[in-house]
């Protein structure tokens, strides 16, 4: 007979050992991947709850399974909190990921084979914005806009010209590695000129939008997608927002029964908790510090002689361009990892190297800010990054920095 009351230590010590090692890695290292964060114990408690046992195909009040009264309450709370957080009329909290949220919108706004226009992956876009290896590039005719080769910024005149040339049905405004504010009014103007709908994928900066530290896309976008982790600091998942009743009905049907079956109600519970946390004044203060920490870090890296894409940042992330140095993005990532600093290799505009090697690294401040780190720590971390990248093959330097990183981390426990 299967016992439901045994602990993880009793049932699967191998998995527990891996979890404990990961806990140690997170506690004693500096997490600087821009898309990662530390969610709260409350979110994890909700996500690890008994709700994982419940199937609930459909939407609150209209399920295809019985026994959904309590998960209806949970999902309804998540929806209402999301609507309040972003000032929208309709929200779908069921997408399992940001990618599935995007897929739901594409299927709502376009037919297979029609044209979509998004930021080029190598210039800071996301796989789901039209990459040929992704469903977005397989199911749709994907065109892309790129960054200005001189400034490293978006050039809206160029985007307009591209849109007029390719005549997309959907324009995607969003990124995975762009350190500047997006001008949604200009994107909307371009979309209107070519008769396209506008999707804003705010997965990276949703937490900043929620707190007024980034302009809101709500007045301009037909659809808005986001992940619920990253700067929102919730569980890993996705969400779609809109102010159109008609579009809400379409997007809901594209998520279920279109591309998903049963929603993950335990994850939706975690989303609801995270949205509730984000509605509190403390979260607004946190988001402001995410941005200010990124600016300090950028200034320090510039002072240390590093080249940054666009020369700085307006948001939570920094893109370091190493193309003028001998070191590759891959070596930089590995060397920093050996020193207890986790970043990710990233392509830069006009990339000459393979995406598996790259000429840049992407660095973010959301997780460090969650730990309570501020400007003083950013200055010290910038020094460590410089020391490691300037001595990438020197084990002595990396070991010394790693020990110093551990000491700093002890002062800022995660939980």
UniProtKB/Swiss-Prot annotation:
UniProt GO MF annotations: glycine hydroxymethyltransferase activity; pyridoxal phosphate binding
Pathway(s) the chain acts in: One-carbon metabolism; tetrahydrofolate interconversion; Amino-acid biosynthesis; glycine biosynthesis; glycine from L-serine: step 1/1
Keywords recorded for this protein, A-Z: Amino-acid biosynthesis, Cytoplasm, One-carbon metabolism, Pyridoxal phosphate, Transferase
InterPro entries, sorted: PyrdxlP-dep_Trfase (IPR015424), PyrdxlP-dep_Trfase_major (IPR015421), PyrdxlP-dep_Trfase_small (IPR015422), Ser_HO-MeTrfase (IPR001085), Ser_HO-MeTrfase-like (IPR049943), Ser_HO-MeTrfase_PLP_BS (IPR019798), SHMT-like_dom (IPR039429)
Gene Ontology BP terms: glycine biosynthetic process from serine; tetrahydrofolate interconversion
Coiled-coil ranges per UniProt: none
Compartments, as annotated in UniProt: Cytoplasm
Entry EC no(s): 2.1.2.1
Cofactor(s) needed by this chain: pyridoxal 5'-phosphate
SUPFAM superfamilies documented for this protein: PLP-dependent transferases
Modified residues (N6-(pyridoxal phosphate)lysine): 230
Plays an important role in substrate specificity (site feature) positions: 229
Catalytic activity: (6R)-5,10-methylene-5,6,7,8-tetrahydrofolate + glycine + H2O = (6S)-5,6,7,8-tetrahydrofolate + L-serine
Keyword Amino-acid biosynthesis carried by entry: yes
Top-level class of the enzyme under EC nomenclature: transferase
Gene3D superfamilies named among the record's database cross-references: Aspartate Aminotransferase, domain 1, Type I PLP-dependent aspartate aminotransferase-like (Major domain)
Residues engaged in binding (6S)-5,6,7,8-tetrahydrofolate: 121, 125-127, 246, 354-356
Assembly and interaction partners: Homodimer.
Family statement: Belongs to the SHMT family.
Biological function: Catalyzes the reversible interconversion of serine and glycine with tetrahydrofolate (THF) serving as the one-carbon carrier. This reaction serves as the major source of one-carbon groups required for the biosynthesis of purines, thymidylate, methionine, and other important biomolecules. Also exhibits THF-independent aldolase activity toward beta-hydroxyamino acids, producing glycine and aldehydes, via a retro-aldol mechanism.
Name listed for the protein in its UniProt record: Serine hydroxymethyltransferase
Organism: Bdellovibrio bacteriovorus (strain ATCC 15356 / DSM 50701 / NCIMB 9529 / HD100)
Taxon lineage: Bacteria, Pseudomonadati, Bdellovibrionota, Bdellovibrionia, Bdellovibrionales
